[in-house]
């Protein structure tokens, strides 16, 4: 575990979200074309981050294994996680990061991800207080959920290639449910 002078670092990987109310925790992630939405309630002192690969839509069917790749699913999970920890929807504020065009020959999924996040937050009535999206380089992001402070570093060279590789990797498979049935 990597410790920073002022806190404990928790890494958020593709397809995950984290919600915390500990002022000593810093959430971090590495983004290429993926997008991370960072949200918090400044009054209750709870905040969190998600990291999604594709925008998705409420009409596109997603299996349980696929759902965590999509922004539409992870945005809802993050908001619900914040509300469960005492946040109020009317006080939520958000910052959006990522959405780079890391591979020139592919469609600009990063731009689509960022546009989705903006529209989703607008539709939900959540105020966007900061944004750093687009460009051609990946980012390393650090977010202090309780205070809302965010810091990013542009990734170049080997770090950028690692971010691109991470964006192309499928999200981890869901863990089997204990009550599931296994056929032989």
UniProtKB/Swiss-Prot annotation:
Residues 165-184 are annotated as: Disordered. It is an enzyme of class 3 (hydrolase). One of its GO terms (biological process) is chemotaxis. The gene is cheD. Its EC number is 3.5.1.44. Signal peptide: none annotated. Keywords: Chemotaxis, Hydrolase. It comes from Sinorhizobium fredii (strain NBRC 101917 / NGR234). This is Probable chemoreceptor glutamine deamidase CheD. It comes from the Bacteria. One of its GO terms (molecular function) is protein-glutamine glutaminase activity. SUPFAM superfamilies: CNF1/YfiH-like putative cysteine hydrolases.
